[in-house]
A protein has these predicted regions:
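Short, strongly hydrophobic alpha-helical membrane anchors
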Residues: 1-14, 254
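Small-residue-rich hydrophobic segments that form or flank transmembrane alpha-helices
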Residues: 4, 14-83, 143, 147, ...
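Residues within membrane-spanning alpha-helices of integral membrane proteins
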Residues: 16, 59, 112-116, 120, ...
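A helix-boundary/kink motif common to multi-pass secondary transporters
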Residues: 38, 50, 104, 108, ...
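Membrane helix-loop-helix hairpins that form the core translocation module of multi-pass transporters
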Residues: 53-125
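Hydrophobic alpha-helical transmembrane segments in multi-pass integral membrane proteins
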Residues: 54, 95-100, 109, 149-155, ...
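Transmembrane helix exit motif
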Residues: 66-74, 111-135, 222-223, 228, ...
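Cytoplasmic-side transmembrane-helix entry/capping segments in multi-pass membrane proteins
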Residues: 78-89, 110-113, 133-143, 173-180, ...
Length: 254
């Protein structure tokens, strides 16, 4: 177990244990809510992995978790409704990547975190809001904003997740929209990371090591998801958004 070497240092059995634990919990969060896997695992992995290694693993596992989620919900997918978000995201991701040269992502993450904390806290304290009407133009704009944020911070799901919740859709309808949109953004990131040479042999070894734990957590999360009604799912989303917001605001000590 100590044979995995990253940047010249071997991971000990304790670090590998935490790595596998985070993979399971991250898979569980993705199976239960359809997002938040990256925040769950990053909070642990960044203690012994570099940001690039963590990002590469999160994107790789995201391809699995979101792909599996889309496949599980394939009967409810409405591509005509999804298309405006993906088109907007395809434009937004490169814009966000370009803006990285001019904007400090750390400040942006803190700002996004504050908004998530406010939204999550308000949603948990208040009754369900009246559904917001949508349109193709609005959906494309949300996709654009979601793509810009994904390009800037690597966070492909928050704006689209909140929008789907504000629309007042049932839980399956929400996931049938925001998971394909997130999957499309992740595919773009996989291509970019592959071109950048981030997919090293050691990182792939770690990916394969954590794969069974991630799959197990994903399966358990989906099983529990099937037992949630729309009201309970809404609370799960709000709690995860609140936790994610706090995680973005909290100082990083690694």
């Amino acid at each position: 177990m100590d044979g995995i070497v990253l940047d010249g240092a071997a991971l000990g059995s304790t670090a590998i244990g935490f790595f596998l634990f985070a993979a399971f919990v991250g898979g569980f969060a993705s199976g239960l809510a359809g997002f938040a896997m990256g925040f769950v695992v990053s909070g642990i992995w960044l203690h012994f992995l570099t940001p690039l290694q963590t990002t590469t693993l999160v994107v790789g596992y995201g391809l699995l978790t979101q792909g599996y989620g889309v496949w599980k919900l394939r009967q409810t997918l409405a591509w005509r409704s999804i298309a405006p978000f993906i088109i907007g995201g395809a434009v937004g991701v490169p814009i966000g990547t370009l803006l990285l040269t001019y904007i400090d992502p750390a400040y942006l993450r803190s700002g996004v975190g504050l908004l998530l904390v406010i939204y999550g806290s308000y949603g948990l304290a208040q009754p369900k809001l009246k559904p917001v009407p949508g349109s193709v133009g609005a959906d494309t704009g949300i996709g654009l904003a979601n793509g810009v944020l994904a390009g800037l911070t690597g966070l492909p799901g928050f704006i689209i997740t909140i929008w789907c919740q504000l629309r007042g859709w049932p839980k399956d309808a929400q996931r049938a929209v925001f998971q394909p949109v997130m999957l499309a953004a992740i595919v773009m990131n996989v291509i970019a990371l592959s071109i950048a040479g981030a997919m090293t042999a050691a990182t792939m070894q770690l990916y394969l090591l954590g794969l069974p734990a991630m799959v197990a957590g994903l399966w358990v999360g989906f099983k529990l998801y099937g037992k949630l009604d729309d009201a309970a799912f809404r609370k799960v989303i709000l709690v995860l958004l609140l936790i994610a917001g706090l995680g973005l605001i909290a100082p990083r000590g690694w």
